């Protein structure tokens, strides 16, 4: 019997919250969970080298199927020996299916049973993406974890629309499984949809669990719904997911949502947030959000976060970084991106330690208080 490409090992369950501490084993090594995955859209985490990502203990990164299909082309990545060799990253990689980009970037799209017709957001060319094509591209990319091609419904959507969408996503998931040519080397995750409707999340989860994927994702959240709705959906969705397989919440990366997601049984998260906000000088610190472009930092020669031991905070001042961001210097974006990624990866280390010590609930209270999430006008990102 061949070993599955992806295997989840549960190490400990937090007695205070039920959060899970675990390890996901992949063909390119293992990573501890709960884990945050930095996003490398174009086969690079913007402005960061693979060595820097390793310095900050990134165990796995994410790359985008849609973007790499358009440029440079999955054939070129395959010829290079796969994504790991192409980008010089020897740790695990997860690729999304391209579905989210088709639904979010393309103005013109037509959903059919076969797949989605849409226009290339770069040049307007007509393109078609189907479950089979999404599998072919990801098999060429050679990621450790691949995602099934799903329909990404808008928020909000009616129950009737969402029901049709959920059933289509299930039919597409079956086709993905049939088309996946390298199951021993790449693990394919199914994506549970259903919006905010409990009956539809159950319908989606039950159908996908029957297909027996090596892991499952929760899609259709972090698309504009309030935080309390996201938490409620997680509360009724994660119990429907197999306890012996990884659970991945797609597109979530704010510190409060990472902690709240872990408390609700999620193992993996990804988001462009830390690097996207870094580019305009917004930073995550142990005491909350800091916008370094603000005039009050012009003569502030202290570090971004006195409690942070990252390269940025050990070497550069708020005043200097403010100057770099205001003059649009690339080095400034590198420094802010490094800090934000380090901050979230460090936060996940603290979350894992709190689970180990059965005190994630206490950790959440302390963190929210210090960060300012408990205040009436709490600012998020």
Curated annotation (Swiss-Prot):
Disulfide bonds: none annotated. It catalyses: 7-aminomethyl-7-carbaguanine + guanosine(34) in tRNA = 7-aminomethyl-7-carbaguanosine(34) in tRNA + guanine. GO terms for cellular component: cytosol. Residues 251-257, 275-279 are annotated as: RNA binding. GO terms for biological process: queuosine biosynthetic process; tRNA wobble guanine modification; tRNA-guanine transglycosylation. Keywords: Glycosyltransferase, Metal-binding, Queuosine biosynthesis, Transferase, tRNA processing, Zinc. One of its GO terms (molecular function) is metal ion binding. Binds 1 zinc ion per subunit. InterPro entries: ArchSynthase1/Queuine_TRR, TGT, TGT-like_sf, tRNA_ribo_trans-like. The active site is at 96 (proton acceptor), 270 (nucleophile). The keyword Zinc applies. Substrate binds at residues 96-100, 150, 193, 220. It comes from the Bacteria. Homodimer. Within each dimer, one monomer is responsible for RNA recognition and catalysis, while the other monomer binds to the replacement base PreQ1. NCBIfam families: Q_tRNA_tgt, tgt_general. Catalyzes the base-exchange of a guanine (G) residue with the queuine precursor 7-aminomethyl-7-deazaguanine (PreQ1) at position 34 (anticodon wobble position) in tRNAs with GU(N) anticodons (tRNA-Asp, -Asn, -His and -Tyr). Catalysis occurs through a double-displacement mechanism. The nucleophile active site attacks the C1' of nucleotide 34 to detach the guanine base from the RNA, forming a covalent enzyme-RNA intermediate. The proton acceptor active site deprotonates the incoming PreQ1, allowing a nucleophilic attack on the C1' of the ribose to form the product. This is Queuine tRNA-ribosyltransferase. It comes from Lysinibacillus sphaericus (strain C3-41). The lineage of its organism: Bacteria, Bacillati, Bacillota, Bacilli, Bacillales. The gene is tgt.
């Amino acid at each position: 019997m061949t070993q599955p490409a992806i295997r989840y090992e549960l190490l400990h369950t937090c007695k205070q919250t039920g959060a899970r501490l675990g390890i996901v084993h992949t063909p390119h090594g293992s990573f501890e969970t709960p884990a945050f995955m930095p996003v490398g859209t174009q086969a690079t985490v913007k402005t960061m080298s693979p060595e820097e990502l390793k310095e900050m203990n990134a165990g796995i990164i994410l790359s985008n199927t849609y973007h790499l299909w358009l440029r440079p082309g999955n054939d070129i990545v395959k010829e290079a020996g796969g994504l790991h060799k192409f980008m010089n990253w020897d740790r695990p990689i997860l690729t999304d299916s391209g579905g989210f980009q088709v639904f979010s970037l393309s103005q013109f799209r037509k959903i059919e049973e076969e797949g989605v017709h849409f226009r290339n957001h770069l040049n307007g060319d007509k393109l078609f993406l189907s479950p089979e094509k999404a599998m072919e591209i990801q098999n060429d990319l050679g990621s450790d974890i691949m995602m099934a091609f799903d329909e990404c419904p808008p928020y909000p959507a009616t129950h009737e629309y969402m029901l049709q969408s959920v059933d289509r996503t299930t039919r597409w998931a079956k086709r993905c499984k049939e088309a996946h040519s390298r199951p021993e080397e790449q693990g394919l995750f199914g994506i549970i949809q259903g919006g905010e409707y409990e009956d539809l999340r159950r319908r989606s989860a039950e159908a996908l669990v029957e297909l027996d994927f090596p892991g499952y994702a929760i899609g259709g959240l972090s698309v504009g719904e309030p935080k309390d709705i996201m938490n409620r959906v997680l509360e009724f969705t994660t119990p429907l997911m197999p306890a012996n397989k990884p659970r991945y919440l797609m597109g979530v990366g704010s510190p409060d949502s990472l902690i709240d997601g872990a408390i609700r049984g999620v193992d993996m998260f990804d988001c462009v947030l830390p690097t996207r906000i870094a580019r305009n000088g917004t930073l995550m610190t142990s005491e909350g959000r800091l916008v370094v472009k603000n005039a009050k930092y012009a003569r502030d020669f202290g570090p971004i976060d006195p409690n942070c031991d990252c390269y940025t905070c050990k070497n550069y001042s708020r005043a200097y970084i403010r100057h770099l961001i205001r003059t649009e210097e690339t080095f400034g974006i590198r420094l802010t991106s490094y800090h934000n990624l380090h901050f979230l990866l460090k936060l996940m280390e603290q979350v894992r330690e709190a689970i180990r010590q059965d005190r994630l609930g206490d950790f959440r209270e302390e963190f929210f208080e210090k960060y300012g999430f408990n205040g009436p006008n709490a600012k998020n990102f």
